[in-house]
């Protein structure tokens, strides 16, 4: 297996077969629009070159998905070696189904799909549409070579007029280059509260997001607050989260400062993971049923992390 991306370790680059620095500069310039903390999804992250550098340069959480063992094992090592305490790694091969399901429950500020859509089965333009639905901003790099993998996808990719051409990335195939595009859109509603929630449980929350602020409000209560960068802990588990490790998350739960008032509903789906940090949400929700005291509930979440079964 080739070293596709370069490795980035504490400010130094070890070159892989793909040029990365120039492509990162395109991404970095685009990300400068954010005047707030933001969340990145890096689909097919490989060695996490772009995400690791984004976390160095900006106040962001980056969620990196990779399915190849050589790559995700090295990815987790690199995230740790660079001290990226806002890094999240999935061991997951994205499909159209998993992209669609992810968009039902999560919202990302910046989605990176760098030379990846031709590796995903199915109609490539449907794949692009599903990736667009994941957040406000999407950057995509498109393969075009006759000897690239996934020729059916390569030859049928259509980039619409609503995409902005940002530049080109030098390919690893012969002397060709690949076009890099960006697209912006706004989404305010979710289809589900969390993965696996009971059918008929209405999401009931609204997102207001721009480059300067991001807030969440609720249909059934008066609370409105800043969006917490990261993803739901249930999403992390469902998509094969391997970094931070379970041991690290258990330690975070044990050391977590107790809420000022009893929460009453500490469950996996009421926790947001922002890398090494975990944040409780939905305290004092008038619609929830108090299940047990908070200390026992935290023990229940710790057991769930290792077993995948919620029994508190």
Residue ranges and their predicted role:
Residues 275-312:
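C-lobe/activation-segment region of protein kinase-like
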Residues 216-247:
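Conserved structural core of kinase catalytic domains
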Residues 112:
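A conserved beta-strand element that flanks and buttresses the S-adenosyl-L-methionine
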Residues 119-130:
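A short, conserved alpha-helix within the catalytic core of class I
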Residues 135-146:
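Conserved beta-strand signature within the Rossmann-like core of class I S-adenosyl-L-methionine
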Residues 1-36, 41-105, 179, 189-220, ...:
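Conserved N-terminal segment of class I S-adenosyl-L-methionine
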Residues 260-268:
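Catalytic-loop of the protein kinase fold
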